[in-house]
């Protein structure tokens, strides 16, 4: 008897469902994508108990003809592709014909559909993949799919479900991203009878952003646009003052499909450069139109990973689109808004001074700042970075080799109290620094307001006035920016001549990194780093380039190897620019340091000559601005509608 058998169709569908259907959100994604492919203009998603009890998706699309209804539940039955060459010009969201049979195999599925050219519609009921009923019915044009008792015959899958709130959050995230990908479609999401999401479907991406994130956020989104012969990039990005603590608010779309792509995420951050604080991420919707021949979507069951030809050119296009758009914006943060944001943060406690004023006298419209209430602020009491102990000399007598030094990864230090938000691991910080350096090198000259200095507070903040109102400058951040640009400009071409080491260094790597570095060793050789094999997963360095100081060898080699593993290239300028960031931080004036008038005015003059005077190299704001209108609002000289009290006859 043969040991190899063909699996029953129901079992095969359940196995396929394990790849495609991970949770209720996966069902929602597949059904809504089918509705989008059917040219729907309205899609309603109704769920109960976060989709575990019921998911119902209703659309007004083309519908399914009666002859095709049963075929739609067969594996690999699809109307999207017909021959092999079609795989290279896919423009629909679905094409494999796996989703519907996979869903039907692990639930009770009810499908009602009708097309424009048929008198009657069709009702189909399947339970666990087996068709129980098919009949003609009267139903509106379009399709309604109901999925009940999800995972009823695969209880092991239910064990891995999180809370109802967590599963609901995944569903909302799916609908939000599909809404941003298709602003021309009106989406409605209802959970347990309560409407959670609703978009207008007018084709305006900014309007879709307002429907998902709120009007206040949509107003702070900046449009971007760029194109070349292969790609068209458009979308919206948030101003640098509007950030999140993770990448979840970055949406990348290719031909209307939401994808995940590490390199494109990096390109977005590169476009911001030092305008973002370290560890903060923007809200962004990047819509990329591309010839289907340049994108392969058939590489992952969920189709969220896409292989892109000419990926480096696309990265440059995205980065330049963002940088060009931000260059046109006024990037001095509004001080009144920041004051409202920090004052509502309950995690920080401040000593309060009693004033003979009622609390209600301070005028803020806090509803306008609701978006910021959920942000977390790290206390200045964050622990400082520590330095790893220096390497220990170890004598190796094998094969007559001289003494060698085992290299250790070291962490550069900076006065962390001057950057209370930079409480990151060494690896995270290096990645962030690498990310901003490229844009720091290419910054263009910005216009800076003409300021008149008139005072200092607590040896930390400088006060100046200009046509735009009152400006408050962080003296450490200001001098850090000035010194960074000074050190950066001193970085030029370096001498790759080599110098012999008296004591060679040994560098150990994980096995996978070691093999990758072996393949790419020629790239390291180009910048004067010559590593030789020395035992298992270990390289030995016997000489170093003259431009690299011996005390920097350990950290420099590890950092350049990390750079090579991450980006497939090594840039000496990039590495030296990271040093410039550290040097500017350590050698700048600190808080509680009193400046005389001459030094303060000179600092403002130097700041005005910087290419980017608005942010320190770490992304913190250098100055904030109180406009005259802000001051008048704080002192109640104008009302909410900006009507002057003098005009009202009350002053």
UniProtKB/Swiss-Prot annotation:
GO biological process terms held by the UniProt record: mismatch repair
Which NCBIfam families would you find in this protein's record? mutl, PRK00095.1-3
Annotated HAMAP family? DNA_mis_repair (MF_00149)
**What is its biological role?**
This protein is involved in the repair of mismatches in DNA. It is required for dam-dependent methyl-directed DNA mismatch repair. May act as a 'molecular matchmaker', a protein that promotes the formation of a stable complex between two or more DNA-binding proteins in an ATP-dependent manner without itself being part of a final effector complex.
Stored Gene3D superfamilies: 3.30.230.10, Histidine kinase-like ATPase, C-terminal domain, MutL, C-terminal domain, dimerisation subdomain, MutL, C-terminal domain, regulatory subdomain
Supply the InterPro entries for this chain: DNA_mismatch_repair_CS (IPR014762), DNA_mismatch_repair_MutL (IPR020667), DNA_mismatch_S5_2-like (IPR013507), HATPase_C_sf (IPR036890), MutL/Mlh/PMS (IPR002099), MutL/Mlh/Pms-like (IPR038973), MutL_C (IPR014790), MutL_C_dimsub (IPR042120)
Per its record, how is this protein called by name? DNA mismatch repair protein MutL
Coiled-coil blocks? none
Gene Ontology MF term list: ATP binding; ATP hydrolysis activity; ATP-dependent DNA damage sensor activity; mismatched DNA binding
Does the entry feature the keyword Glycoprotein, yes or no?
no
| Database matches in SUPFAM superfamilies | ATPase domain of HSP90 chaperone/DNA topoisomerase II/histidine kinase, DNA mismatch repair protein MutL, Ribosomal protein S5 domain 2-like
Q: Which SMART domains match?
A: DNA_mis_repair, MutL_C
Q: Name the family the entry cites.
A: Belongs to the DNA mismatch repair MutL/HexB family.
| Superkingdom of source | Bacteria
Origin organism of this chain? Streptococcus mutans serotype c (strain ATCC 700610 / UA159)
